[in-house]
Amino acid sequence: MKPQKSLRARAMDILSRQELSRIGLKRKLAPHAESEEELENVLNEFAERNWQSDLRYAEAYIRSKSRKHGSLRLKQALAQQGIDEETSRNLLPDRSSEKLAAIAVLRKKFKHPAADLKEKQKQARFLAYRGFDADTVQTALKHAWDDGWEEDC
């Protein structure tokens, strides 16, 4: 039988594989902690030593998801992980990058422009579900199949 790992060793193993927010790390460690105080001590130590950083987690998350998702969805996901709104707002891509991402996502999913209103609504719902705001959705639907669409954003 394997000996039980200490909470500190578990945290180190988890963070060596992936960046996590404080809340995410707490969720993973909670079942193994003997007390809330022990868990908080480990979390505080890791934060002080900069082994766990909410800012680093937010940067990595946005970098990996911003090509497929809009700022609304990214903000919501970061808020669920305990990242404050100001931090997430500062890290989110600018409006033109978001519009280019929406156009790229739209062109990848739908190979041709909408033929009728029903198809256009389907495309708009798809982008809205991905977290793009109404202005970005309208811009993407308008310019996605135009030549030189990059300059219009």
Swiss-Prot record:
It comes from the Bacteria. InterPro entries: RecX_HTH_2nd (IPR053924), RecX_HTH_3rd (IPR053925), Regulatory_RecX (IPR003783), WH-like_DNA-bd_sf (IPR036388). It comes from Neisseria meningitidis serogroup B (strain ATCC BAA-335 / MC58). The keyword Cytoplasm applies. NCBIfam families: PRK00117.2-5. Disulfide bonds: none annotated. Belongs to the RecX family. It is found in: Cytoplasm. GO terms for cellular component: cytoplasm. Keywords: Cytoplasm. The keyword Protease does not apply. GO terms for biological process: regulation of DNA repair. This is Regulatory protein RecX. Modulates RecA activity.
